[in-house]
Amino acid sequence: MAVTTDITATYRGPRKVIARLLAMGPREDRLLAFLMGACVLMFIAQMPRLAREAHLNGQELNMLLGGALLGIVFIAPLGLYALAMISHLIVRAMGGQGDGYQSRLVLFWAFLAATPVLLLNGLVAGFIGTGPALNAVGGLWVMVFFWFWVSGLIEAYWGNT
């Protein structure tokens, strides 16, 4: 299936999508594409907020975009790889059966699949600014991300795949 089709299917049933991705076999190139795609989309989601901040504070937009690009696209993937390793160790300590690939797949897919809500969060931050709407959309993104991540971990480590 196309990635966009899998993303929409994740909102209907995240465990089914993870099971299908796991059935494709381990491929690190696919994981890296998921991760980098999610990071690029996260960077794009930050653009409206950064443009608003630059306009309101009189800062240079290119400087803000450069810092966000460095942090999100180049440094954040390293942190996400470390988070995947830590979650793998925790799940294994809880009795889950699997390897590090499954943990990376689930985390990176949850991050990518939750990006539509993250893009909405960026629009709210850029057009409305701080306030209850931004908090609500940010909270929604966190809930969606954790729903996909935990459901995926359950499927990957305790499912029948």
What are these model-predicted stretches?
Residues 1-40:
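N-terminal juxtamembrane cytosolic/stromal segments of multi-pass membrane proteins
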Residues 2-14, 58-66, 95:
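Juxtamembrane loop-helix boundary motifs flanking transmembrane segments in multi-pass membrane proteins
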Residues 6, 11-19, 48, 149-161:
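Juxtamembrane interface elements at the cytosolic ends of transmembrane helices
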Residues 23-27, 59, 133:
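Interfacial loop-to-helix junctions that mark the boundaries of transmembrane helices
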Residues 48-73:
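Membrane-helix boundary elements
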Residues 64-75, 80-161:
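Hydrophobic alpha-helical transmembrane segments and adjacent short intramembrane/lumenal linkers
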